[in-house]
């Protein structure tokens, strides 16, 4: 028999290991709605309200808080408790003045890193690809599923793996951070997840093999990671606070 649409359920034991939730306390978990991030690199908004921040004891209480519009993601009110909040997203609570950025820690778990109100208006976006669209415009497609249009004359300022510092929620480009030697990067996946440092070398391989970058951390230690795991967050120093 053919499938009747996407899966709607998720057992806790099968939930991504990046989530900080109790796996044996209950049978079912909240399955994030299809959206800006994939399931492995995001977490449902309900868990942020209840399990991460402790503003609710039950899912019902968490949904009530969200329905009152008390939580913002990237400067916009989000009421959907299944909304996927992923890497580099900013979670804000205007009533308490709290602001957090979603980042992975050294064991690959998604955490809420406290940030200032000023930094909450800045979101780094990694360019996945770009393409031409109607009206002689170039569409930049970012890691969080969003996109942005730029004039054709500016196409040579933006390339794959570059990072755009976007002002949210206005969606205004503040700065472009190139992926090059000397750039400051944060590793988002792999065995070196959450490590940070400056790019020393970019190794390119033929025949479809993924590119590798060599990074020097703050202690002077060198390590390698895949290019797609390295997220540029600054030129000679990070433009955002990191854990």
Curated annotation (Swiss-Prot):
InterPro entries: KOW, Rib_uL2_dom2, Ribosomal_eS4, Ribosomal_eS4_central_region, Ribosomal_eS4_central_sf, Ribosomal_eS4_KOW, Ribosomal_eS4_N, Ribosomal_eS4_N_CS. It comes from the Archaea. GO terms for molecular function: rRNA binding; structural constituent of ribosome. The keyword Ribonucleoprotein applies. Transmembrane segments: none annotated. Signal peptide: none annotated. Residues 43-105 form the S4 RNA-binding domain. One of its GO terms (cellular component) is cytosolic small ribosomal subunit. Pfam families: Ribosomal_S4e, RS4NT, S4. Gene3D superfamilies: 2.30.30.30, 2.40.50.740, RNA-binding S4 domain. GO terms for biological process: translation. This is Small ribosomal subunit protein eS4. The lineage of its organism: Archaea, Methanobacteriati, Methanobacteriota, Thermococci, Thermococcales.
């Amino acid at each position: 028999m053919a499938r009747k649409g996407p899966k709607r359920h998720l057992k806790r034991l099968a939930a991504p290991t990046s989530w900080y939730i109790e796996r044996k306390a209950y049978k079912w978990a909240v399955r994030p709605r299809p959206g800006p991030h994939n399931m492995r690199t995001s977490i449902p908004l309900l868990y942020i309200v209840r399990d991460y921040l402790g503003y609710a004891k039950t899912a019902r209480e968490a949904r009530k808080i969200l329905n009152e519009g008390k939580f913002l993601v990237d400067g916009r009110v989000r009421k959907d408790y299944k909304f996927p909040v992923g890497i580099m997203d900013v979670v804000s609570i205007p009533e308490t003045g709290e602001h957090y950025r979603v980042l992975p820690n050294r064991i690959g778990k998604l955490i809420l890193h406290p940030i200032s109100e000023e930094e909450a208006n800045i979101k780094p976006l990694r360019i996945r690809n770009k393409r031409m669209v109607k009206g002689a415009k170039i569409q930049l497609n970012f890691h969080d599923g969003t996109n942005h249009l730029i004039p054709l004359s500016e196409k040579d300022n933006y390339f794959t793996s570059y990072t755009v510092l976007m002002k949210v929620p206005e969606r205004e480009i503040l700065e472009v951070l190139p992926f090059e030697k000397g750039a400051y990067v944060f590793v988002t996946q792999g065995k070196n997840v959450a490590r940070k440092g400056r790019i020393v070398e970019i190794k390119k391989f033929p025949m479809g093999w993924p590119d590798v970058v060599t990074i020097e951390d703050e202690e002077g230690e060198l390590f390698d990671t895949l290019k797609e795991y390295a997220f540029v967050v600054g030129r000679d120093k990070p433009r955002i606070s990191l854990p």
